[in-house]
Amino acid sequence: MAEDDMVSLLFKLKVEDVTCSDDPEKHMKNASNERKPLIEPVENQLMDIGEEGGSLDYWLLYLYVDCLTMMCCFHRGSLPYNWMQGALLTNLPSYQHDVTLDEVNRGLKSASDFFGYVDPMRSDYFTAFSFPGRVTKLNEQMELTSTKGRCLKFDLYASTQLRFKPGELVRHGECKFAIG
């Protein structure tokens, strides 16, 4: 069903100001070279979360999903089932610079036993929520190993109420974990 929605959005997409080029390969390389500094992490770079917008005074929980699911959350106002009892969220921030995406996937898979976390591409996006009093803190924690070998622990939360209010989804985007 979500795939049908995305396909219908693509059919409605209008592309304007397209010109024909005699050397598309050259333009593709130029575009790729311009994009590289934007996507390649710099050693020991910390993300300035102030750039994300919004107040940082409230408590945030993160849901790690693929791009399509993130967009469905954003447009439909509902959480996906990614756990046997609803939605599994964590307080692991999406810009944790000393944890790799593979390690996050390993931790989420062991915590949730959800098949979706086998492939790192299924969780390289996030949605961040502010749920005052709507989630249950689980007794277990997600244990991750940092890139420096330290053990990091993050709390896990469950939500059986999958619909959320528009103001509760406060951020969404691509994860900024360490490369490794």
Swiss-Prot record:
Which GO BP annotation is one of this protein's?
Answer: cytokinin biosynthetic process
- Root EC class: hydrolase
Q: Which UniProt keywords apply?
A: Cytokinin biosynthesis, Glycosidase, Hydrolase
| Documented EC number(s) | 3.2.1.-
Q: Which GO terms describe its molecular function?
A: beta-glucosidase activity
Q: What does this protein do?
A: Hydrolyzes cytokinin glucosides thus liberating free cytokinins.
Q: Which named protein is this?
A: Cytokinin-beta-glucosidase 1
Tell me which species this is from: Linaria vulgaris (Toadflax)
